[in-house]
């Protein structure tokens, strides 16, 4: 079924063969709740608990393709969620750092990604993804899987020269757009908006008191 999903995504316009092959080899059913396994290969988002979703496969593939991975990159993912996107990145990049703010999702992803799948090139952290992972920065690629009103400054600061960030931008209840931010070697940034999207909002930890 994963191979059929990859073929469908190819018909829908995904062209990166490495992305399609990774989707064909990774069983999305492992990342959805048991009662939704029968719907795992449908091209639509599914609830995974805690008010969060696993994104529509086309959007996952589109965002992954937009990163332009060739296999050696250091990637920061903001929002581990189900771990599906993380596992795809692990197959396509050199090393992945992923941050999840929801404790229950973070624990579930850790058990699946590091335990069941044994992904040695994945590092996981429970925390505020909008703050990035400063001690591991800079990153060649940054992928944000929740929408923010603007690019979080800490993430912008952690993007390496020559790097690329892909993220949804917009308010939770208004129009959002998938944006690509590229930083040239000289530090000059180029921004391109790709397509309208709908993501859960990027949440933050409450301030310390």
Swiss-Prot record:
Reactions catalysed: [protein]-L-isoaspartate + S-adenosyl-L-methionine = [protein]-L-isoaspartate alpha-methyl ester + S-adenosyl-L-homocysteine
Subcellular location, principal: cytoplasm
Entry's localization field: Cytoplasm
Broad EC category: transferase
A Gene Ontology biological process term: protein modification process
Pfam families, sorted: PCMT
GO cellular component: cytoplasm
Active-site residues per Swiss-Prot or TrEMBL entry: 55
One example GO MF annotation: protein-L-isoaspartate (D-aspartate) O-methyltransferase activity
E.C. number: 2.1.1.77
Keywords recorded for this protein, A-Z: Cytoplasm, Methyltransferase, S-adenosyl-L-methionine, Transferase
UniProt family annotation: Belongs to the methyltransferase superfamily. L-isoaspartyl/D-aspartyl protein methyltransferase family.
Function: Catalyzes the methyl esterification of L-isoaspartyl residues in peptides and proteins that result from spontaneous decomposition of normal L-aspartyl and L-asparaginyl residues. It plays a role in the repair and/or degradation of damaged proteins.
Protein name: Protein-L-isoaspartate O-methyltransferase
Organism for this UniProt entry: Anaeromyxobacter dehalogenans (strain 2CP-C)
Underlying gene: pcm
């Amino acid at each position: 079924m994963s191979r059929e999903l990859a073929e469908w995504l190819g018909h829908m316009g995904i062209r990166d063969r490495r992305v399609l092959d990774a989707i064909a080899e990774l069983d999305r059913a492992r990342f959805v709740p048991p009662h939704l396994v029968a719907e795992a290969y449908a091209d639509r988002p599914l609830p995974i608990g805690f008010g969060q979703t696993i994104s529509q496969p086309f959007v996952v593939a589109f965002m992954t393709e937009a990163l332009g991975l060739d296999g050696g990159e250091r990637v920061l993912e903001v929002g581990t969620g189900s771990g599906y996107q993380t596992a795809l990145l692990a197959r396509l990049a050199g090393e992945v750092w992923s941050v999840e703010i929801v404790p229950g999702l973070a624990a579930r992803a850790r058990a699946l990604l590091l335990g069941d799948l044994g992904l040695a090139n994945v590092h996981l952290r429970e925390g505020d993804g909008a703050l990035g992972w400063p001690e591991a920065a800079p990153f060649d690629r940054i992928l944000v899987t929740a929408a923010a009103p603007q690019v979080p400054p800490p993430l912008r600061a952690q993007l390496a020269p020559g790097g690329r960030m892909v993220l949804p931008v917009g308010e939770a209840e208004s129009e959002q757009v998938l944006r690509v931010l590229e930083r040239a070697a000289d530090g000059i940034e180029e921004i391109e908006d790709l397509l309208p999207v709908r993501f859960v909002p990027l949440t933050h930890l409450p301030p310390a008191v």
